[in-house]
């Protein structure tokens, strides 16, 4: 039982979501894109994710494998985007 608890503590929970701009004029907005998977993947990995891509229908970077506690995941609650 103790080994299971220790294993669960070591395993980091991952989360997926849209990347969020955290500074400047677009703070609180999703990171936008059109077709640039390379940019989204690089930005995702810089923020601790495993894979990022441009979700074409939403025109925003989507990141998989971010730490669950990441402040870089866009949510409606954090949406302070005015545009």
Swiss-Prot record:
Record-annotated disulphide pairs: 29-81, 33-54, 40-61, 44-63
Family per record: Belongs to the long (4 C-C) scorpion toxin superfamily. Sodium channel inhibitor family. Beta subfamily.
Cellular compartment(s): Secreted
Tissue and organ distribution: Expressed by the venom gland.
Biological source species: Lychas mucronatus
InterPro entries attached to this UniProt entry: LCN-type_CS_alpha_beta_dom, Scorpion_toxin-like, Scorpion_toxin-like_sf, Scorpion_toxinL, Scorpion_toxinL/defensin
Pfam families in alphabetical order: Toxin_3 (PF00537)
CC terms in the record's Gene Ontology section: extracellular region
The name this protein goes by in its record: Neurotoxin LmNaTx34.5
Domain of life: Eukaryota
Known function: Binds voltage-independently at site-4 of sodium channels (Nav) and shift the voltage of activation toward more negative potentials thereby affecting sodium channel activation and promoting spontaneous and repetitive firing.
Residues spanning the membrane: none
GO biological process: defense response
The entry's keywords: Disulfide bond, Ion channel impairing toxin, Neurotoxin, Secreted, Signal, Toxin, Voltage-gated sodium channel impairing toxin
């Amino acid at each position: 039982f103790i080994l299971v608890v220790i294993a669960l503590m070591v395993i980091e929970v991952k989360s997926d979501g849209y990347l969020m701009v955290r500074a400047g004029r677009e703070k609180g907005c999703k990171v936008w894109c059109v077709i640039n998977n390379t940019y989204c993947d690089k930005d995702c990995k810089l923020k601790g994710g495993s894979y990022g891509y441009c979700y074409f229908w939403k025109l925003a970077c989507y990141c998989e494998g971010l730490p669950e506690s990441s402040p870089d995941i866009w949510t409606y609650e954090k949406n302070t985007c005015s545009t």
